Amino acid sequence: MLHLMIKPGQLSLKQLRQVSRSPVVLSLDPEAIPAIAESAQVVEQVISEGRTVYGINTGFGLLANTKIAPQDLETLQKSIVLSHAAGIGELMSDETVRLMMLLKINSLARGYSGIRLEVIQALIELVNNQIYPCVPKKGSVGASGDLAPLAHMSTVLLGEGQARYNGKIISGLEAMKIAGLEPITLAPKEGLALLNGTQASTAFALEGLFVAEDLFASATVCGAMSVEAALGSRRPFDPRIHRVRGHRTQMDAATAYRHLLDVSSEIGQSHSNCEKVQDPYSLRCQPQVMGACLQQIRSAAEVLEVEANSVSDNPLVFAEDGDIISGGNFHAEPVAMAADNLALAIAEIGSLSERRMALLIDSALSKLPPFLVDNGGVNSGFMIAQVTAAALASENKTLAHPASVDSLPTSANQEDHVSMATFAARRLRDMGENTRGILAVEYLAAAQGLDFRAPLKSSPRIEEARQILREKVPFYDKDRYFAPDIEKANALLQLAVHNRLMPDQLLPSQH
């Protein structure tokens, strides 16, 4: 199991990817403790001096001008958590909640939120005991932060709400007991500090990023397999072509194809002097299209790594100056736009894959048997598998519509512009599943096409990719129940089996 000492503000994408995939044991860097204590002391000083400061002794949103009496401050913190836990729909996965909790811990531990160490440690203990609050997926507009999801997360700290432990749903009170904790009475500012922030949106977006990385790798491998199966030319991957255009990601994508389609391929050698001048765009323009997708992935990764290490609370406590300042770091517009760009990349990866698969089943273009099966007519082969791929590609086109351009005012127009980051990021999982399904169909089709080129072999990496599939799915010699083949190919892609065939340091979370 991964052991991770949190150095606040220094989480890497590689670490975040690991936490998104498996349980973790967290600890807090002792050097972070003084800053946490100092910010909490500033809040205590505000209360002792009787000053009025938003989020500490006032109402929230439109009620920000309502001062709360000292005897009601503890009730205020509990009330904000319980009243804001108003999400709806299916529950987030344990993986998403674990990542969200890590992001919240990382943000609070930077020492700008005025929250006590014991609250942060309680979140750490829940994660370490693999106790994950039950958090509905829907109910956040991404400003003022992810209020509803983070409120559901926080109810467990109060001994309220529900959590999941070993696959079973238990009460928040029982969850705290299992973690060896007593329910927490939140001090002034702490309820708001827990609820304000972009951690739900960012967790969804990071998961989408990691899915996009895996899809990019698999699509590149499947695309190279399709080049071989269709007897496509290698000349479009010549580094000189991409160097004169100048896009770094296009050059990197072309390098990946050359890495896969090396000169040892017998299939490539067999038609090196053929008369065919140009391949269809779905083969020839792969570096250009996939390079553009890689640019979106890298750009989103840069934004999300910053956001994962950010302080998105409000108000913020600057202990060195004794100041508490209201701002808008909770507005998740950067996350929303990054997620929108990832959606474009995921959709285009799938769209290009579907076109390559359609090319392979077209005997006029690929010079392979119609629908990749012998005895056509009696056998329909990959005919309807391509229809499935087309349906998934079309669905992704609708899902790729930008969410960040939408906004609905909330909280009686006090919060009059919102980011919709949570939906922007949440839909990436569905889009990823669609694109993975398309790639599964292409993977099957490309391997089938390569088998028809026997006894000629491709390059070692392409042959390894083909063999990985053939260990699970045999050659399609005649019509059989097709769905299990797609499911098996899909399962392999979900395991990211192609990542090891790609060049190192290509994708952001590899660094």
UniProtKB/Swiss-Prot annotation:
Protein species of origin: Vibrio cholerae serotype O1 (strain ATCC 39315 / El Tor Inaba N16961)
Q: What PANTHER family does the database record attribute to this sequence?
A: HISTIDINE AMMONIA-LYASE
What does the PTM comment of the record read?
Answer: Contains an active site 4-methylidene-imidazol-5-one (MIO), which is formed autocatalytically by cyclization and dehydration of residues Ala-Ser-Gly.
NCBIfam families assigned: hutH, PRK09367.1
List UniProt keywords, sorted A-Z. Answer: Cytoplasm, Histidine metabolism, Lyase
Do you know which HAMAP family this protein is assigned to? His_ammonia_lyase
One molecular function GO term is: histidine ammonia-lyase activity
**What is this protein's gene name?**
hutH
Main location, first listed in the record: cytoplasm
Name recorded for this polypeptide = Histidine ammonia-lyase
Disulfide-bonded cysteine pairs: these are: none
